């Protein structure tokens, strides 16, 4: 009877993953592609699955495919803060417990996401098709930075914080951000960032006003619709060959009992959760970094009543991405040299500079350069960096989990006490048994 009940429960439970659904995440074609990728390229890089980015945030492939994504209740707060507040990443989910595979090309470049699994036949800005199997294709990111690299371009944190958020994207693509106490000189920021004029933004706002149920008050839009709406709007100027950076403030507290709201542009979604939601995502500031723009935008507004204001827009030319790759020297290493708690490799540089790992900063690391331990810094707001002189060097990073040594000592002491207690208990019981026999 229990077996019958268990069977009926499982076949009717819609929350269980069915075999056909599992095939979307793991199948022979996907396995073939990841195996082919790792066999052809044994260097150290990250990958991501664009076909199922949320369901596969914690899913590794082939044992040597590293990820920049994680869904967990415990995570590195410094890295999480960087993920949610730098590089114009979108926030498309209802909480801040996930570091998902966003659609932001700059983020994937910066984090060393070299290979992307997607459906075949796509034309993707910055990517080239590499391998194909069945309905799937591995695309190579032509601009992906190494996970570990050296550069002689940097600015101080003080200068970085004086820049607006779009200028900060350019800073991070042009060099590294150093703590004030170690940034003795600074690079000059390129002048490639272009601000979209107020007149051009006004033209777009007028188009939105004509196409959507909105009420305008200057540059503020009040959106009120019972159904989601999607329309394609024209831009006053083509953005082909450029990155388009957009930001805006969104407020869904203008009416009582508001639900979640979202705005999606060219398939990139930002969501603001209902004010009453217990895991509120605090995403009042929507940012988009678009790499597939020509002279139109596909714009979607969710149902609800909410306000949009403070709209800003910028463009960056593609050459910024090319220069970002050209001005760094990669760490020579393989996936096999990045195992367990150790990262090792060699690097040769012509100038004094800094070595950076796009690995989240933590106090548990030790690093040696040519066998000599070196102090490291928190660079680029959330990552690991060390000064590095010109020449050829062997670098080894080792991670020691905070509290691990203390935990091992406590475990050994506890085990010793248990053994002592067991021995004493056995001795006492034996003596008591002998007394009973004698008596």
Task: Tell me what each language-model feature is.
Residues 200-439:
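Active-site-proximal, structured, solvent-exposed surfaces of multi-pass membrane proteins
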Residues 90-136, 142:
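Periplasmic/luminal catalytic loop of GT-C fold multi-pass membrane glycosyltransferases
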Residues 52-53, 117-123, 361-363:
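Short, polar loop motifs at secondary-structure junctions
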Residues 2-17, 35-108, 145, 150-169, ...:
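Extracytoplasmic/lumenal acceptor-recognition loop(s) of multi-pass membrane glycoenzymes
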Residues 55, 104-107, 114, 127-130, ...:
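Nucleotide-cofactor and metal-assisted catalytic machinery
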Residues 109, 134-209, 307-323:
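Catalytic cores of secreted or luminal carbohydrate-active enzymes
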Residues 3-35, 275-281, 311, 318-329:
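Membrane-proximal, lumen/periplasm-facing interface regions of secretory-pathway glyco-
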């Amino acid at each position: 009877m229990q077996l019958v009940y268990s069977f009926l429960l499982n076949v009717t439970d819609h929350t269980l993953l069915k075999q056909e659904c599992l095939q979307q995440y793991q199948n022979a074609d996907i396995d073939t592609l990841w195996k082919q990728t790792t066999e052809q390229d044994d260097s150290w890089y990250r990958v991501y699955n664009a076909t199922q980015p949320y369901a596969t945030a914690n899913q590794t492939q082939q044992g040597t495919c590293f990820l920049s994504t994680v869904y967990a209740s415990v995570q590195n707060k410094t890295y999480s803060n960087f993920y949610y507040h730098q590089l114009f990443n979108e926030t498309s989910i209802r909480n801040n417990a996930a570091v998902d595979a966003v659609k932001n090309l700059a983020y994937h470049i910066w984090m060393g996401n070299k290979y992307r699994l997607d459906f075949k036949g796509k034309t993707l800005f910055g990517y080239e098709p590499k391998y194909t199997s069945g309905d799937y294709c591995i695309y190579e990111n032509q601009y992906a930075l190494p996970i570990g690299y050296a550069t002689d371009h940097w600015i101080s944190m003080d200068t970085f914080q004086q820049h607006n958020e779009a200028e900060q994207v350019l800073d991070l693509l042009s060099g590294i951000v150093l703590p004030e106490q170690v940034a003795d000189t600074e690079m000059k920021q390129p002048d490639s960032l272009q601000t979209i004029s107020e007149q051009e933004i006004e033209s777009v706002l007028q188009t939105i006003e004509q196409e959507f149920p909105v009420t305008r008050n200057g540059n503020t839009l009040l959106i009120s619709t019972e159904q989601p709406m999607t329309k394609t709007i024209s831009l006053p100027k083509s953005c082909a060959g450029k990155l388009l950076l957009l930001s805006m403030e969104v407020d869904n507290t203008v009416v009582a009992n508001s639900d979640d709201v979202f705005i999606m542009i060219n398939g990139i979604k930002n969501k603001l959760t209902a004010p009453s939601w217990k895991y509120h995502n605090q995403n009042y500031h929507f940012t988009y970094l678009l790499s597939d723009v020509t002279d139109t935008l596909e714009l979607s507004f969710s149902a609800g009543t909410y306000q949009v204001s403070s709209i800003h827009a910028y463009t960056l030319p593609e050459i910024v991405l090319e220069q970002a790759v050209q001005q760094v020297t990669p760490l020579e290493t393989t996936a096999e040299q990045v195992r367990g708690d150790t990262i090792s490799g060699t690097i040769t540089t012509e100038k004094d500079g800094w070595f950076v790992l796009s690995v989240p900063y933590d106090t548990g690391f030790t690093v040696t350069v040519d066998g000599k331990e070196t102090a490291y810094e928190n660079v680029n707001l959330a990552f690991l960096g060390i000064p590095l002189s010109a020449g050829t060097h062997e670098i080894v990073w080792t991670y020691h989990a905070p509290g691990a040594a203390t935990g091992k000592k406590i475990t050994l002491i506890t085990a010793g006490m248990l053994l002592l207690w067991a021995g004493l208990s056995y001795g006492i019981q034996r003596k008591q048994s002998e007394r009973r026999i004698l008596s």
